[in-house]
Each structure stands twice: as structure tokens, then as C-alpha cells.
Amino acid sequence: MKMQYRLLIIIVGLMAVVSFFYWRWPIMTGKLNGQTIYLAVLNSFHVKDSHAHPQFMLIDDDSGKGIYKIREICERVGVKATFAVVPAFLDSARCDSLKKWQQEGYGIALHSYDHGRWKDWTKEEVVSDIDRSLAFLRERGFETNKINLVVTPGFYNTRAIRSAVATKGMKMIMGANVVNPDTTTSQWGRLFIKKETDIDETRGVLLRAKEKKGFVVFGTHSSIPDEFSAEKTEEILRIAHQIGLKLK
């Protein structure tokens, strides 16, 4: 009899766990990886902001020559992107352009000083690298008090990186194909727009995000021609804008 009760308790417990994750599991796309599962589980326990509304943003990595294409797309659609800069990759012209755009309302995020392997670094080394990037931008006239987002190079996510970013009071973008529950979480997933991205599938994700009042972060590598699609980037931003997601 005791065995039957134990079995019943186990079954009820498993059903409760499955039910919990079923209702709270976030929207995901693409291939599963360790970071996607990690963030999905983390977000399942997140207490959603009661004032949340569906939002989106675009982050373009590496601050290469493709930033001008992103700027053109944003101006046509009527949105403003955030540029994840790598100071060591910047020439004076792009630096001046990004500084001017920040003054116009475009965002600036950090993407390490020279795209180093943060995966193998200590917390202190990551903090030092963040400080070095901020100092570079500050010296060139950027408003570094407005920079509060770190896009980890290589999408690495280690305890040292998380601790370093938290120490700086910033949020981080990781390599997880997850729609975020809202903007209050400290780690954000991101959906990349590439040449092979399915527009209809992405529209479906955006509609579900709107229904759940989620926060969609899109990513692009505008400076990698083999990956970047200006046409799909513009179309997806228009869809997000048209179905009612607000720009973060």
C-alpha cells in the first residue's frame, strides 16, 4: 500500500512539473543548444512584469562597414537599432558615425574590446575588458552612461562572464534562441536574422510574442555578407512594427 502511495505521489509530482513548464516555457526557434535550454529554464521561473507589453529591438554586431546598411533600413522602417561595438574594429569614420547616431537615439552596446575569448577569462579580466571598451568610447565623445548592454563575444556564457556583467550593473545578450518574457531579466536571448531565415515562421513567432507580451531581440551580422540579408532584415522589422510590437 505504501508503495502505491509513493508511486501516486511521484506521478502527481511529475505531472505538476510538466504542467508548470508547459505553461511557462518560453517561445524558442532554431536549433536547441545548451544556452537556449539554460535560458528557457531560467525564464520559466521569472515573475513577469505586470506592466509588460510586447516589444522588440535589433542589435547589429561587430561595428563593421555594414552599419550603414542597418542605418538605411532603420530609417526606411522608422525604427532605431542598437550597435554592438568592438572598439578595436572601429575606424575613425565609423566611430564618428556611431557617435552621431547615438545622439540621434540609436543604441550602443559593448561587444568586448577586440572580440577576445571571454570563455576562458576570469571575472576580473572580463571586467577590465568592459572598462577598457567604455574608456575608449568615453574618450571619443560617446555617452557611456547610456550603455548598459553587453553582447558577449562568441555568445559565451560562463559564471565569470555573468558575474562580471552583473558587477558592472549591465544586462547581457547570450547565444540563446529565446523570446524574452520581458525587459526586466538580466540575460536576454536573441533571434538572428540570416539569409536562410524563414519569414513566415518568424511572423508566427512575432504573433505569439505579441500574444504573450514578450520581448523579441533580433540580431544581425551586417558586416558578414555570406550571412546578412538586408531584405529579410527590413521585412522582419516591418512585420514587427506593423503587428504592434513597440520598439525597445
Where in this protein do the model-derived segments appear?
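A structural signal for short, well-ordered beta-strand segments and their strand-loop junctions
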Residues: M172-G175, K246-K248
